[in-house]
Amino acid sequence: MTSSAAAAIKQALGAYGETLAARHLVGQGMVLLERNWRCEAGEIDLVLRDGDVLVVCEVKTRSSLRYGTPHEAVTDIKVARLRRLASRWVQDRGVAVRDIRIDLVGIVRPRRGSSVVDHVRGIG
């Protein structure tokens, strides 16, 4: 497999995971505000509202656990970056928020069987 083919597969898996995560969170009563918001400092996968709390959600999707769980891929450095990006999103959009929460949705999509979705609230 070429590196461009591998990159395309990885990108498709990520897009699948973000769509599945968004559906799951909206099904839990959250309101999706934005997907894949970017600035020069980075990207937020999903921005949602959960009541009066702004939720910035990192989505990690894996096709296997060979390289660890989706949760293991989110370091303290990544959480700190998401906090900074959340503040930047609020400033950029000019919205007032009472609180900001960072969530993680980890998805494992095996070759056979159903995907497993694990939502962790307040990772940092």
UniProtKB/Swiss-Prot annotation:
Signal peptide: none annotated. It comes from the Bacteria. InterPro entries: Restrct_endonuc-II-like, tRNA_endonuc-like_dom_sf, UPF0102_YraN-like. Transmembrane segments: none annotated. GO terms for molecular function: nucleic acid binding. It holds the Pfam family UPF0102. NCBIfam families: PRK12497.1-3, PRK12497.3-3. Belongs to the UPF0102 family. This is UPF0102 protein Noca_3248.
